């Protein structure tokens, strides 16, 4: 049918035939039923009229037969599809618009399916405009309608089953990436859409990680002539060219390219757009595809088409009709009828109506295919194919694009004929390689897409060109290759400008001549089956004779790999950070010398040891001793948080600071190097080279060394040529591949593996667990390199050498080495951060503890052996006194008493109720003072266990500091004979008391210096004992002992104690006897321990104030007093311990100090008879005498009870507090507190108590105090200080009270802490 070009449409007979055909086809719909009606026509289905419009004379023959075929192919429930085929002859846009508008105005249709073969780019905008104007869905299935040049009209339902320019470019760039064709040039004319084409290329290349090299865009003028076009095409050097132009413009472009030599096999052209692909023929092999001018298309042309590009016309049109039918079915389901659409192009625009109907045609599924469209009207997931023009000028499908995934056949390159023979191409190289990590790594292609991942290139197995494969033989398997050498190959192709086909050699060898035939990569190049061979190919003399090698790009040689063997940790590993000389210097020299130096500085310091002795501030000895100095320095070395005592001298402090700095450096250096010695020492064999005796004489070792290599390589060639005996031995241990050799090394079946150094270094760095190591930290023997093998005299050798040298100069080779040849394992560094220390690592420390425990057990056994066995074998000798004194003196240098806590303010005193006093029993006979030497020797002579009960318990505190040395001559109350002392005085008889458990305390004894001239008594001013013989008295003076007691046990429950006269030993002297009328009573057992006693002779501020207030006269009303367990919780009595202490023998040697000498109750002198200023103190309790009492004449004796006449005026300040009988005893109970010094003044209604003033002085000071008058000299039994209860409330001593000698009655059996001065003792 021939269409007219006027607006009135067809005329004459043609018009009548068209109207008759339309009437017979009955395209006009029947009366539309109401909503919900189903069916229509004869079958009850609604009629759906779809116009099939074909533009071009090629469709005239098939158009009449399409209607029934399409109606049968597209069946939709509830619709009667009635396709109407129309053919338009006009090809220009104006004629096309007029014909379509006349057709739509004369027919009542529901949709249009359009196809043309004109490839006119203006068709798509016309169809888009008509759809927006009439609201009709228009589906373009083929031809130039597959290109939209302008944005879609608003409300348009113009849909395209073809692919857009952007989608075609996306597929083309996937192909370029797959084959590493990164350099390209864009060639275009000024055809409609060329700007969009260039913009799409910029979008795809900018920001991509592939590294595209867009070498420019050429905009050609097809009418400029072939010479000008050829010059423009040659101006840009690129093998890959992307062409976008109209069909009639392609002929001059390809003719100019062919004249310029740019259409050969070395160049690849990609056609973009629907203008050229599939044109000029049916695609049947053998039928040439010609351009409009009759010129054939060049071989190797690629294009991207829709997957149905080879489908027949009926199937293509049926797909478009199905889209319209499925959308109409959705409309009918929602509305119940098919809406009336516009049929006149000249009517008012129906954009608002088209927007509401547009969504029903966007998501369609038909024939198991998805026809979902995007906003531009193209398919979201189009099915595309990549077609290539073969040498026979036929289109071949080489790839497909489904669901955004590309699948390509291999090989894609159209270089192979019927028998896979490559065509001649000067710019295309066939490259052979061999898999060997990390230089060439072969992986399978992606099983889903069949493509290679980024940074890898396709490679294949070797082709068999000897025999022709069968027609149905599969193509070579596609593989993906990557690695160090592959990256170099890609850079060479990019720099020099060639394409390549990569394949793997079949025999898997580098190259060796066997029976006169070369195999491997060298054989492929030598026999010219490959243009180039790249990989871990070592350059050697034999290979260089038949092929040419490029400059080496990797330095290598021969190396030896072994496996690390697990070693053991030495038990002395914890001592290995320092040498034995350092340990000896540290602990034998440095620690001892510095400790002694610090002690000497502290001893000579004005505020340290010596100063304390000189001033008497610390008469008990220094608190910083040699032992504490060593302990302090030891704690500083090892950062032990132990209690230490710091020196007070500035010089010693500086020494300690310097030692602390030294200790930090010492300990930090030790800990920093300890981890390296605590790990297991791994053993690695070392060899000097291939000529080492271990390789040349392996049988001489036991077991023999097992080593091998991979045969048919340069390593084996080197060994075979230079060490034939070694080669003959290692043949039995050769391995087929490197990976198998490494497995044998780890399993212990192979001791060493000899191979290329570059490969072994990589394997060692990448080994899991870092168990493999190359000997000598990667030491290389027979150094050489890797090169690229080429034909002899190849023209590619010089460009490749220059390119490799450029890579070396630009550090690209070094960058690739860091990328591919590096790893986490290093030969010279063993990473052990994650390894755990087990019992083997710490065995040495445990062994040291076991040895220390064994030595402790030996010392423990020796201690008990000496104490229970050997000490009784010692004969009676006076040398033991020297050993005893020496041990005590040494102990005094290593121990000291801790300083007491700070004092607290005292609470107010509490009154004491008056107890009842039973009659006192008569005192025992006087006990003379026992010399220290005699007492110690006598104790050693006595057998074990002769003392009273409790003696062993008393000695426990002594043994705590002195070990198996017995405290001798301490007045322990043992039953013993009365030997004569040095002064002729007998020893004190033991006092029989019931066994008592002594408190947990301790004591110590030292000798004091003897006076140069013996006084009349033990001390001046005190009564003398019975006179010894004159010779003995003149020869030996009375030795003095010191003793102090501190109660360490918790105080007994508070209760009102009962005092016992014998529990209060008072100082006295002379040979006076007891009063005849003194009552006697057996001392009962006390439940609570009695207080301790000490002498306190320092002046008191309160005493000074009292003296000044009375004008220096004696304070007759101020009477110090004391009582056992009196609950005065004065915390400030917790001061430093007293400096002068006296033993039991010294206190008990004066019989006048016994309570048995107290006068009868109610006697004239009963009221206040004290020997000293005595006071009651809570635990620890002390007996003290103040200096004020001495100055005030407190020892002025009252007349004895048997003396006649009134008693003289006494200057003694003594008295007792007035009790409060009305208070219950429970109200006076108070917890034991610190010792206090209490004084009180007698007042009219009671007693007031001045503030406490603790003092301390020795008994020598007491005896040397000034006296008020000669008449006050103490004489007779009345010279003893007596306990003085108040006359109105105090009676005789309580019968329940016990002696002050110890808890059970003997003060000597009490244990206490020793406070004494070793520098004043005779050691």
UniProtKB/Swiss-Prot annotation:
Descriptive protein name: Glutamate receptor ionotropic, NMDA 2D
Q: Which residues lie on this side of the membrane: Cytoplasmic?
A: 602-626, 639-650, 865-1323
The organism's taxonomic lineage, starting at the top? Eukaryota, Metazoa, Chordata, Craniata, Vertebrata
Q: Could you name the Gene Ontology cellular component terms for this entry?
A: endoplasmic reticulum membrane; glutamatergic synapse; hippocampal mossy fiber to CA3 synapse; ionotropic glutamate receptor complex; NMDA selective glutamate receptor complex; plasma membrane; postsynaptic density membrane; postsynaptic membrane
Matching InterPro entries: ANF_lig-bd_rcpt, Glu/Gly-bd, Iono_Glu_rcpt_met, Ionotropic_Glu_rcpt, Iontro_rcpt_C, Peripla_BP_I
Q: Please describe the quaternary structure of this protein.
A: Heterotetramer. Forms heterotetrameric channels composed of two GluN1/zeta subunits (GRIN1), and two identical GluN2/epsilon subunits (GRIN2A, GRIN2B, GRIN2C or GRIN2D) or GluN3 subunits (GRIN3A or GRIN3B) (in vitro). In vivo, the subunit composition may depend on the expression levels of the different subunits. Interacts with PDZ domains of PATJ and DLG4.
* Native organism: Rattus norvegicus (Rat)
Q: Which sequence ranges are listed under topological domain Extracellular?
A: 28-579, 672-840
Chain intervals with Pro residues compositional bias: 899-929, 987-1001, 1080-1092
Source organism, top-level taxon: Eukaryota
Which segments show compositional bias classed as Basic residues?
1208-1228
Region Pore-forming, annotated ranges: 628-647
Q: Which Pfam families match?
A: ANF_receptor, Lig_chan, Lig_chan-Glu_bd
Phosphoserine sites (modified residues): 1313
Q: Where does L-glutamate bind?
A: 536, 538, 543, 714-715, 756
| Catalytic activity field | Ca(2+)(in) = Ca(2+)(out); Na(+)(in) = Na(+)(out); K(+)(in) = K(+)(out)
Q: Where is the composition biased (Basic and acidic residues)?
A: 931-940
């Amino acid at each position: 049918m021939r269409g007219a070009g006027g607006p009135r449409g067809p005329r004459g007979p043609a018009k009548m035939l068209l109207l008759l055909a339309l009437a017979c086809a009955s395209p006009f719909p029947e009366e539309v039923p109401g909503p919900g009606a189903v069916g229509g026509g004869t079958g009850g289905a609604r009629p759906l009229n779809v116009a099939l419009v074909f533009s071009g004379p090629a469709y005239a023959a098939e158009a009449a037969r399409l209607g029934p075929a399409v109606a049968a192919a597209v069946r939709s429930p509830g619709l009667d599809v009635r396709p109407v085929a129309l053919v338009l002859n006009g090809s220009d846009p104006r004629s096309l618009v007029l014909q379509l508008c006349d057709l739509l105005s004369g027919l009542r249709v529901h949709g249009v399916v359009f196809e043309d073969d004109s490839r006119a780019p203006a068709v798509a905008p016309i169809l888009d405009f008509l759809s927006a104007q009439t609201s009709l869905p228009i589906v373009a299935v083929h031809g130039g309608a597959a290109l939209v040049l302008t944005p879609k009209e608003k409300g348009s339902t113009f849909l395209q089953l073809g692919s857009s320019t952007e989608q075609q470019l996306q597929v083309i760039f996937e192909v370029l990436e797959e084959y590493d064709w990164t350099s390209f040039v864009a060639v275009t004319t000024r055809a409609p859409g060329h700007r969009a084409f260039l913009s799409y290329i910029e979008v795809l290349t900018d920001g991509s990680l592939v590294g595209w090299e867009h070498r420019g865009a050429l905009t050609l003028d097809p009418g400029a002539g072939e010479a000008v076009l050829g010059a423009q095409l040659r101006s840009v050097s690129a093998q890959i060219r992307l062409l976008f132009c109209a069909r009639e413009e392609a002929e001059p472009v390809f003719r100019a390219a062919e004249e310029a030599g740019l259409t050969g096999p070395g160049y690849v052209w990609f056609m973009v757009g629907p203008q050229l692909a599939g044109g000029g023929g049916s695609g049947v092999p053998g039928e040439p595809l010609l351009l409009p001018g009759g010129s054939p298309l060049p071989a190797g042309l690629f294009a991207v088409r829709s997957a149905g590009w080879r489908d027949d016309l009926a199937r293509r049109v049926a797909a478009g009709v199905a889209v319209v039918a499925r959308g109409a079915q959705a409309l009918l389901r929602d509305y119940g009828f098919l809406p009336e659409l516009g049929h006149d192009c000249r009517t008012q625009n129906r954009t608002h109506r088209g927007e509401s109907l547009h969504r029903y045609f966007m998501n369609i599924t038909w024939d198991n295919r998805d026809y979902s469209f995007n906003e531009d009207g193209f398919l979201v997931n189009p099915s595309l194919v990549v077609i290539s023009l073969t040498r026979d000028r036929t289109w071949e499908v080489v790839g497909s694009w489904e669901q955004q995934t590309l699948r390509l056949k291999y090989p894609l390159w159209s270089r192979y004929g019927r028998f896979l023979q490559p065509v001649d191409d000067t710019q295309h190289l066939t490259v052979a390689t061999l898999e060997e990590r990390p230089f060439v790594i072969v992986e399978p292609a992606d099983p889903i897409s069949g493509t290679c991942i980024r940074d890898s290139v396709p490679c294949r197995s070797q082709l068999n060109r000897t025999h022709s494969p069968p027609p149905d033989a599969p193509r070579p398997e596609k593989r993906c290759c990557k690695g160090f050498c592959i990256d170099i190959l890609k850079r060479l192709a990019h720099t020099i400008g060639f394409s390549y086909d990569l394949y793997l050699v079949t025999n898997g060898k580098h190259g060796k001549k066997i029976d006169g035939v070369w195999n491997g990569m060298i054989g492929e190049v030598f026999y010219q089956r490959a243009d180039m061979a790249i990989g871990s190919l070592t350059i050697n003399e034999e290979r260089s004779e038949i092929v040419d090698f490029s400059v080496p790009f990797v330095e290598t040689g021969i190396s030896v790999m072994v496996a690390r063997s697990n070693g053991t940790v030495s038990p002395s590993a914890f001592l290995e950070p320092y040498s034995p000389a350092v340990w000896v210097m540290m602990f034998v020299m440095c620690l001892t010398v510095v400790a002694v130096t610090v002690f000497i500085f502290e001893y000579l310091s004005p505020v340290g040891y010596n100063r304390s002795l000189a001033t008497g501030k610390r008469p008990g000895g220094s608190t910083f001793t040699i032992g504490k100095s060593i302990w302090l320095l030891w704690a500083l070395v090892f950062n032990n948080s132990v209690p230490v005592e710091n020196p007070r001298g500035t010089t010693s402090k500086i020494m300690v600071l310097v030692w602390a700095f030294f200790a930090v450096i010492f300990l930090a250096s030790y800990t920093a190097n300890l981890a390296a010695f605590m790990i297991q020492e791994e053993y690695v064999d070392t060899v000097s080279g291939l000529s080492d005796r271990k390789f040349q004489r392996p049988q001489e070792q036991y077991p023999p060394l097992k080593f091998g290599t991979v045969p048919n390589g340069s390593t084996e060639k080197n060994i075979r040529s230079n060490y034939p005996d070694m080669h003959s031995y290692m043949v039995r241990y050769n391995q087929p591949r490197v990976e198998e050799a490494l497995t044998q090394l780890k399993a212990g079946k192979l001791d060493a593996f000899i191979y290329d150094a570059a490969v072994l270094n990589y394997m060692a760095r990448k080994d899991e667990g870092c168990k493999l190591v190359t000997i000598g930290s990667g030491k290389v023997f027979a150094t050489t390199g890797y090169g690229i093998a080429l034909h002899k005299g190849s023209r590619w050798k010089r460009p490749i050498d220059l390119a490799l040298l450029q890579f070396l100069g630009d550090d690209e080779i070094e960058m690739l080495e860091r990328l591919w040849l590096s790893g986490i394992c290093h030969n010279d560094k063993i990473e052990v951060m994650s390894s755990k220390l087990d019992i083997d690592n710490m065995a040495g420390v445990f062994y040291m503890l076991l040895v220390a425990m064994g030595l402790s057990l030996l010392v423990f056994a020796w201690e008990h052996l000496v104490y229970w066995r050997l000490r009784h074998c010692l004969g009676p000798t006076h040398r033991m006194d020297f050993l005893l004194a020496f041990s005590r003196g040494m102990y005094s240098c290593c121990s000291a008493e801790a300083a007491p806590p700070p004092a607290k303010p005292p609470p107010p005193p509490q009154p004491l109720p008056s107890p009842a006093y039973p009659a006192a029993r008569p005192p025992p006979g006087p006990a003379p003072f026992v010399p220290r030497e005699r007492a110690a020797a006598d104790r050693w002579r006595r057998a074990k266990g002769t003392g009273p009960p409790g003696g062993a318990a008393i000695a426990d505190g002594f043994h705590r500091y002195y070990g198996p040395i017995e405290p001798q001559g301490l007045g322990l109350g043992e039953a013993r004979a009365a030997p004569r002392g040095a002064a002729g005085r007998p020893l004190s008889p033991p006092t029989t008391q019931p066994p008592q458990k002594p408190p947990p305390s301790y004591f110590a004894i030292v000798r004091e210096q003897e006076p140069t001239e013996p006084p009349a008594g033990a001390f001046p001013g005190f009564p003398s004992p019975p006179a010894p013989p004159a010779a003995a008295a003149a020869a030996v003076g009375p030795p003095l002992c010191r003793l102090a007691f501190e109660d360490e046990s918790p105080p007994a429950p508070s209760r009102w104690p009962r005092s016992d006269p014998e529990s209060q030993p008072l100082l006295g002297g002379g040979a006076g006897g007891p009063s005849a009328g003194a009552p006697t009573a057996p001392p009962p057992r006390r439940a609570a321990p009695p207080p301790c006693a000490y002498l306190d002779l320092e002046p008191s501020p309160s005493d000074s104030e009292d003296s000044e207030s009375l004008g220096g006269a004696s304070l007759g009303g101020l009477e110090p007093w004391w009582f056992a367990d009196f609950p005065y919780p004065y915390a400030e009595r917790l001061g430093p311990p007293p400096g002068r202490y006296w033993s039991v023998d010294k206190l008990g040697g004066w019989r006048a100090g016994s309570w048995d000498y107290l006068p009868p109750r109610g006697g004239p002198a009963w009221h206040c008879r004290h020997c000293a200023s005595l006071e009651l103190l809570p635990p620890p309790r002390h007996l003290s005498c103040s200096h004020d009492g001495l100055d005030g004449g407190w020892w002025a004796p009252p007349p004895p009870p048997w003396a006649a006449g009134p008693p003289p005026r006494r200057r003694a300040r003594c008295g007792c507090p007035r009790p409060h009988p009305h208070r219950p005893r429970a109200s006076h109970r108070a917890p034991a507190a610190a010792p206090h010094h209490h004084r009180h003044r007698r007042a009219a209604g009671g007693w007031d108590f001045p503030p406490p003033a603790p003092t301390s002085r020795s008994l020598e000071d007491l005896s040397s105090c000034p006296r008020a008058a000669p008449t006050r000299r103490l004489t007779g039994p009345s010279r003893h200080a007596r306990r003085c209860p108040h006359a109105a409330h105090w009676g005789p001593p309580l019968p329940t009270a016990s002696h002050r000698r110890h808890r059970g009655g003997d003060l000597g059996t009490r244990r206490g802490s020793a406070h004494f001065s070793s520098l004043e003792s005779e050691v």
